Amino acid sequence: MAISDWPASERPREKLLERGPDALSDAELLAIFLRTGCKGRSAVDLARELLSTFGGLRALLAADCKAFCQGLGLGEAKYVQLQAVLEMSKRHLGETLQRQTQFANSQSVKDFLNSQLRHRRSEVFAALFLDSQHRLLSFDILFNGTIDGAAVYPREVVKKCLAHNAAAVIFAHNHPSGVAEPSEADRQITDRLCRALQLLDIRTLDHIVVGEGDAVSFADRGWL
């Protein structure tokens, strides 16, 4: 049955307008983006099939162009559109974070880092550079790694802190495996960075590890 034949209250677009985007499932939100179905399937049917094929929204958003275009009814134009929407979402969160006078709690930082790092297929190490009032100066990806890890060099981190004239820093990296639990190596490199920055009176406020739908804060665990 075509979506146009559904009751108005069940059509994704009408449902969003009436009840807000939070009321829609992943498939319904994706269907609005897709706009049309194909080969006898409605946009919602196609969206459900895509989510099933990729194993969920996270994997779909993280897919490269080749993998994405193998999906039924999808091509480069849809891939470009989806990446543009994803990037706008990241930038929106980034602007929101920058406009805060200071960080009220770690949750807003986790939300931002989730948006920036969760969908990456390889591990990256990043930092939020802050002024003396804990306002954001810059968010930088410092090191890129493989699926297994990213090499982190304290000397380069120090250079970045000085370049931004940062008074404090929050480190972050992702675990492409989806498991956010920090490793012993994560704790060791954090200790090394803390010691290096202490010599310059730069505070390490937190190190957040981003997994799939979860983020672990070193500060919340009392490790800093």
UniProtKB/Swiss-Prot annotation:
CDD domains: MPN_DUF2466
Binding site for Zn(2+): 173, 175, 186
UniProt entry keywords in alphabetical sequence: Hydrolase, Metal-binding, Metalloprotease, Protease, Zinc
GO biological process: proteolysis
One MF term in the entry's GO annotations: metallopeptidase activity
All copies of domain MPN, residue ranges: 102-224
SUPFAM superfamilies, per database record: JAB1/MPN domain, RuvA domain 2-like
Motif JAMM motif, chain ranges: 173-186
Family to which the UniProt record says this protein belongs: Belongs to the UPF0758 family.
Alphabetical list of NCBIfam families matching this protein: PRK00024.1 (NF000642), radc (TIGR00608)
Protein's recorded name: UPF0758 protein TERTU_0184
Lineage: Bacteria, Pseudomonadati, Pseudomonadota, Gammaproteobacteria, Cellvibrionales
